[in-house]
């Protein structure tokens, strides 16, 4: 269907709805991972709004932490989606990092905004505790004595200053969304907040005992963030349970698209639009397709050849790899192995036929 015919088919209200939901192709602070020095980064990363540039110039060391943290949360995103058709692939030369795929207000967009916001909190908070930032240090509120279910303890060590991480992340990450008043901006703000809350959810108290023979007559405790994988796993569960919403009548909030489902909480991820199937390469949708992706012949999950390859079939190639074998334990403290060649079959998804290459997803 060409553009002129499509324009005739869309009614006025529907055109307005699509314009309301679809943001323009823009750059993002996510592109900061490719920047060099802080001054170059602040002045040349496309897409930063004025408030973000102000924070960038005032806190160059924080920006460095954010930039380094981008690799960590993108790797976590790729880990969580490793067995799915869309695998959170990034585009090094794209200013938006993920290309057009996140222009759709989908579950995937909800997850990426949440995990990126969480990643900023994690990176800044960790940098505070490691003494890398002038603007913060350990949590100043964790001093003196306190009580828990095990009795009295003294705050000591270095408690992670997660409140600072959350405050800075909110100011920096949310700045662009707060300039917009459309539905997508509200969706992004909601998912950004859910990501920040997820990091704090796994803040844990760690203690060290002092006393004769470890009797723990005196305890010193501090608060520490859990490994970022816990945040990733939690947000992955929220992705699978994400709630589809529509804007309320006054345009200030959400209501569930299906009245049978519960209203989303601040911890839930929300989205507006259904996802494409990601089966074929579609430049407009930002989908790279699954041609050439490795699939699991024995799996019944999303990584199975049947699901991953979208019914197109798969190719099988015999490959060899070096593995450790014939390992033996040597007294007292060593295990010695030989290097062996192992042959195995690798299955990869077939490309779509020329007839279906341009078919809509």
Curated annotation (Swiss-Prot):
Disulfide bonds: 77-88, 128-136, 138-158, 207-221, 209-216, 279-310, 295-305, 309-349, 325-340, 327-337, 332-333
Keyword line: Developmental protein, Disulfide bond, Extracellular matrix, Glycoprotein, Lipoprotein, Secreted, Signal, Wnt signaling pathway
Free-text description of this protein's post-translational modifications in UniProt: Palmitoleoylation is required for efficient binding to frizzled receptors. Depalmitoleoylation leads to Wnt signaling pathway inhibition.
Entries under SMART domains matching the protein: WNT1 (SM00097)
Taxonomic superkingdom: Eukaryota
Keyword Secreted assigned: yes
A Pfam family per the record: wnt
Glycosylation sites noted in the Swiss-Prot or TrEMBL record: 296
InterPro entries the record matches: Wnt, Wnt2, Wnt_C, Wnt_CS
One MF term in the entry's GO annotations: cytokine activity
Lipidation (O-palmitoleoyl serine): 213
Transmembrane segments: none
GO cellular component, one term: cytoplasm
Signal peptide: 1-27
Chief location category: secreted
Any GO BP: positive regulation of mesenchymal cell proliferation
Places the protein is found: Secreted, Extracellular space, Extracellular matrix
Described function: Ligand for members of the frizzled family of seven transmembrane receptors. Probable developmental protein. May be a signaling molecule which affects the development of discrete regions of tissues. Is likely to signal over only few cell diameters.
Family membership noted in the UniProt record: Belongs to the Wnt family.
Name of this chain's protein: Protein Wnt-2
Lineage: Eukaryota, Metazoa, Chordata, Craniata, Vertebrata
Gene that encodes it: WNT2
């Amino acid at each position: 269907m060409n553009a002129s015919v499509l324009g005739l088919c869309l009614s006025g209200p529907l055109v307005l709805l699509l314009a309301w939901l679809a943001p323009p192709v823009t750059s993002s602070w996510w592109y900061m991972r490719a920047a060099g020095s802080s001054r170059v980064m602040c002045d040349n990363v496309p897409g930063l709004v004025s408030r973000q540039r102000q924070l960038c110039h005032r806190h160059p060391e924080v920006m460095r932490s954010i930039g380094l943290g981008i690799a960590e949360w993108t790797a976590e995103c790729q880990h969580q989606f490793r067995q799915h058709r869309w695998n959170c692939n990034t585009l090094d030369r794209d200013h938006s990092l993920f290309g057009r795929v996140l222009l759709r207000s989908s579950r995937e967009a909800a997850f990426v905004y949440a995990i990126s916001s969480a990643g900023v909190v994690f990176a800044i908070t960790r940098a505070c505790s490691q003494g890398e930032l002038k603007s913060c240090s350990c949590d100043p509120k964790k001093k003196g004595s306190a009580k828990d279910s095990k009795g009295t303890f003294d705050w000591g060590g270095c408690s992670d200053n997660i409140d600072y991480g959350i405050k800075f992340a909110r100011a920096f990450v949310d700045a662009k969304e707060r300039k917009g008043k459309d539905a997508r901006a509200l969706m992004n703000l909601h998912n950004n907040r859910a990501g920040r809350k997820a990091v704090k959810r796994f803040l844990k108290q760690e203690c060290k005992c002092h006393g004769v023979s470890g009797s723990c007559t005196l305890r010193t405790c501090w608060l520490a963030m859990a490994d970022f994988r816990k945040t990733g796993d939690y947000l992955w569960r929220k992705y699978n349970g994400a709630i589809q919403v529509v804007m309320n009548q006054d345009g200030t909030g959400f209501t569930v698209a299906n009245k049978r489902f519960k209203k989303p909480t601040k911890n839930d991820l929300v989205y507006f639009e259904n996802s494409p199937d990601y089966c074929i390469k579609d430049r407009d949708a930002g989908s790279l397709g699954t041609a050439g992706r490795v699939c699991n012949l024995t799996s019944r999950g999303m990584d199975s050849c049947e699901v991953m390859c979208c019914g197109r079939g798969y190719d099988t190639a015999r490959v060899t790899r070096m593995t450790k074998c014939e390992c033996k334990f040597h007294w007292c403290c060593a295990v010695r192995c030989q290097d062996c060649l192992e042959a195995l079959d690798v299955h990869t998804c077939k490309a779509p036929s020329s007839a279906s290459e341009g078919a809509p997803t």
